[in-house]
Amino acid sequence: MEKIFIFFVLFIYTYSLEPQPLNDLDIDISKFEVASKTNQIILVIPPEYNTTNATLYFYVKNDNKWVKHTETDAYIGRNGLGKLKEGDKKTPVGVYKFNRYFGINPNPGTELPYIQVNESHYWDGDSKSKNYNTLVNYDIYKDFNTFDSEHLIDYNPGYEYALNIDYNKEQTPYKGAGIFLHCFTNNTYTAGCVAIKNTTLEHLYTIINEDCHIIIDTKENMTRYYYNHSLLLYINIKMFMFIFFLLLL
């Protein structure tokens, strides 16, 4: 009985070492693993996995302090979070960067390599194409299925301004393509992208730099992206196994 009690106490102790889920949005941005790599972090936080509404927060580091610059309503995938494959209408969770900047409207004032799309531009959604999940110009490259791709200029409202979230940057076939941060459409959901108000994205475009990171998940899961989460979890498992075998002696 004494061994069982000791085992229980030590189990509770080791579990307590792991960062616990947040109960509010008072998030310590400096604890994110990517906080040392950037001075800009976007959080997209829905209230739960199976919802289409979310809140986008944009944080900027000034004088070594993280300050909330923007908070705005957002929409995510029609089937919520947890994208796994092409066409599942879900928004991916995790930490990402932006790797393409484009829109139907003229450059809003960014120094990023912005492309104002025209009739020739597509987002290649053909899993058999060598340029899968990239922006292509049909005048230059035609070896892809346009039916499986997005003719970008047709998405208005929506793609007045857009940034590609680098989900599936490895271009794994059928894993999914074209996950953007873009403007609101006429729907209260997306096909897997993140959508915010047109004027808000236009403003953010003038601030966002190439090192900006975006983290997408529920608030309860935000500690997963803290710099010490993986290490603490590893230590906890090792300690638990050590204690377990020690008590068996």
Regions found by a protein language model. Give the residues of each.
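Residues that recognize and position ribonucleotide moieties
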Residues: V194
